[in-house]
Amino acid sequence: MLMGICALAFDFGTKSIGCAVGQSITGTAQALPAFKAQNGIPNWDSIEKCLKEWKPDILVVGLPLNMDGTEQEFTSRARKFANRLHGRFGVKVELQDERLTTTEARTEIFQRGGYKALNKSKVDGISAALILESWFERHS
């Protein structure tokens, strides 16, 4: 069980990396603005600024898996991103199964604001929030 930790979660993508912050006390997460990326390479300065602002105890990176639990081509890229986060910032990083989070995020956004609300940045941020909330559930 986790007591009073702050966590940041990332939904890795080649063009955009969703981000969310959460607290273990409530087990909830809030979407933050997504980071732009070029072919999976983020603006590390922006990520560093976010880490300095929130001072997380742990980072959680969504791990994309096939529905049967096997790894896909993108899985190794997400692992590499997680390793780079740890290497650059020295913060503990854990991976969390992210199957269906993008679908759930799109459904949630559509229910709130309809088709026009479905922009990529919002989807990525809410996906990261769902990843973090499922990580909290796994550790409660």
From Swiss-Prot:
Localisation: Cytoplasm
InterPro entries: RNaseH-like_sf (IPR012337), YqgF (IPR005227), YqgF/RNaseH-like_dom (IPR006641), YqgF/RNaseH-like_dom_sf (IPR037027)
Principal place of residence: cytoplasm
Gene3D superfamilies tied to this protein: YqgF/RNase H-like domain
SMART domains: YqgFc (SM00732)
An MF annotation (GO) of this entry: nuclease activity
Domain of life the protein comes from: Bacteria
GO biological process: rRNA 5'-end processing
Coiled-coil regions listed in the entry: none
Cross-referenced NCBIfam families: RNAse_H_YqgF
Function: Could be a nuclease involved in processing of the 5'-end of pre-16S rRNA.
Similarity field: Belongs to the YqgF nuclease family.
Record's protein name: Putative pre-16S rRNA nuclease
Species for this entry: Mannheimia succiniciproducens (strain KCTC 0769BP / MBEL55E)
Lineage: Bacteria, Pseudomonadati, Pseudomonadota, Gammaproteobacteria, Pasteurellales
